[in-house]
Amino acid sequence: MNANLELLSDLVHHMKYAKYLPDKNRRETFKETVDRNKQMHQNRYPDLADEIDSAYQFVYEKKVIPSMRSMQFAGTAIDVNPTRMFNCSYLPVVDWLAFSETMFLLLSGAGVGYSVQKHHVDQLPEIRKPIKSRRYLIQDSIEGWADAIKMLMRAYFDGRPLPLFDYRAIREKGARLVISGGKAPGPEPLKKAINQIQSMFDGKKDGDKMTPLECHDMMCIIADAVLAGGIRRSALISLFSISDEGMMKCKTAYDVVEEEILSTHDGVYNIRLSVWRDGQYCKTQDVFLDKDSYQAMQETGKMEWYYFYPERARSNNSIVIARPLITKELFETKWDVIKNSGSGEPGLYFTNSIELGSNPCCEISLNPYQFCNLTSINVSNLESQEDLNERAKVAAFIGTLQASYTDFHYLRNQWKKQTEKEALLGVSLTGIASIDESDFDFAESAKCSVEENVRIAKILGINPAKRVTCIKPEGTGSLVLGTSSGIHAWHNDFYNRRLRVGKNEAIYKYLLENVPEVVEDEVFGDGAVITVPVKAPDRAKIRTEDVEQFLNRIKHFTKTWVQSGHNGGMNTHNVSATVSIRQDDWSRVSTWLWDNQDAFNGLSFLPYDTGTYVQAPFEDIDKTRYEEFSKRVQRINLEDVLEIEDNTNLQGELACSGGECEVY
């Protein structure tokens, strides 16, 4: 790893995963974070202390990395709430407890996949509006927030008294969170979510049923409250029926039927808009538009969905496509919707059973009420097949340790039962774009992971994993390792990589004093932007590659790595990927997808972005600019960054659909 990537690695670890050490007035070093993670397992399994120590040498050397959730929360936070060990979860919305459990899971830091397929949502009871009411004091905890949602659902689905929520026990905004780290969000995010959901219920009549779109919106509102609480961003995937037009269109523009200009100032319009879809009234909303946006609305008669339902941005949405039932004609119809959306949504989720689901990034195949943990292998600096095999064993060893933390609380019993039954692993690869995959036998290394899982599972007294290998998008984890993201190509031969930072954070002040060249004020905000120049390895794959080359790489690793680690279940795990499609390539991609349905489960799609904008997360630069900038970049000692109080941002690794959306 060169000096620039080392700096980027240090910064991301410090900002996202390092625990605050109050006795030292600083955050952990990478070694201290790994020490804490390793010690957690050694405390639980003292007889394996030596083996654990040997395995973690690969982590210190950044050849393998555990679950980033476990790196973040290792110790008391996981002891208190083992849900924090797991990256991935899935549940169908067949019971109103799904909403409170989702609040609990998201607040615990897990990504949540959920199904609002029609046959699932139809199982919810009819609305029974509450007649009586009673005061309800919300407790200041993850469980307390989840219970507040549970009480609200119980009132409208079970006819119980309507809770009059009392928020006074919730700590004020900015109070320190001792166990998990970071700052308390205060009661406002929860209060806003409860009011929004209650308003939705109040718009229904006794005996009405909730629609899939309404259930989806409630999930997104819950996720919005969690984001405002600083835990995690975009941590949902919503799976919906192929015939559901409401879900299909929920992230498309609305028809404007009435507008009233309330005020104008310096070219900004404050307008009250009423919007319709398919001839039915949807919503009236006050919005602020600049001159260009106002003129565009006048010309098209439409306004984008996010002005009216911004919470829908919290979820990635995917059509559930049953492989045994889909026809080419129906597939092409849905593909045209994705192409014409301009945003690549919804995504596609091919499955052998509509009862199975996935996590937000779609690399894990999950049964209802099931968790999976993740580990990653850095393949960018492999020395030999033996080296790869050894890393595969270590990643499976650590993943199997992680899989044993199933002493869940709060959740229904089926979560523990289903998770223990299949004891899933998600052993991933990252840095693939730096190597020639034909130099290695990934099927052989996948078998090494499977065999090691069987060995250590027997020692721990848990079941061997039904599914072991996957490829996840790798988000900020790849930055910590200094690699390209999962299966994805490097951005370019030379580029600037940007991270945002608050000016109240100690790291900002330290960088400003020691390496001011990498810090600048944020143009469209009150924070700052850190810029680090990056050089892709020689002969690395970069994002200008042909789209079929990328798709065939996905297919290759599905066949060799993922399927070789499959021991059971109707779906294998998956290669998580976002496919960027040039204007002339949509037809080619459609043909490839139809012809290669067995080479993927879920994929996300985006129009290929050739544009530039100020302070973009990735910015192409040439070799001269890279070399000039690099001369001014130096390694820094983050132990010198002193913090009088904990300003940790718990958003950590974002639960996103691809490898290039983790910056902000």
Task: Give the location of each predicted region.
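Extended catalytic cores of very large enzyme megasubunits
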Residues: 1-664
